């Protein structure tokens, strides 16, 4: 079983490209196998097509983006705004975790601007937690594996929580060298340009990603483009406080010293 395996579990088609594709590409360059799993079909992402047509369109776009990232693709398991934290869906997510057998799981922030993101996060965390619990049955059935898993949470959309408080990254990944490839993968989601213009006032989803990437880079104090991450508590996931992203990415990974000081005060 290859320990160099990373799994991104996000809500909608294009969420991975917005928040995590740069980190995945850097891992891929370092010989990691990367896995791409959106839980939702994206069926709500259009004011021009009906739900089934939108879902089919977005499935093709996501598959194209995953190929661009050289990632293994897993199909969605629910529709937009219909995701709930149920044991049935947890069994589905846990099956993908066991199939991918990741050392690193990337997912949404625990608190984000919409429920789909937060429920995806909860399912991803519980599925990762269950990776070494053979008595928890997955759907389809997959064997448990016994290796450390570390979960990292992306920064929330807009870099703040739903009550508008800024959210600080624990660590920054330098995505400058892969930013154009990340942008190209996001551009594969062509159907989203009009939808995001109308629904969320994004002048361009590509420009919005560029701006967020540069802002996170600015916050890093070091990188032009960056993605920010916070590491989940290791209890139940690994034997000790490990940081495999740091170990894998070296100089492209910068820990925010002020965040680390805050952890020392609270633990």
Each model region followed by its residue ranges:
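Active-site rim/loop-helix segments in enzyme catalytic domains that contact anionic ligands
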Residues: 1-100, 130, 239-248, 261-264
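Metal-dependent de-N-acetylase/amidase catalytic core
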Residues: 1-7, 85-267
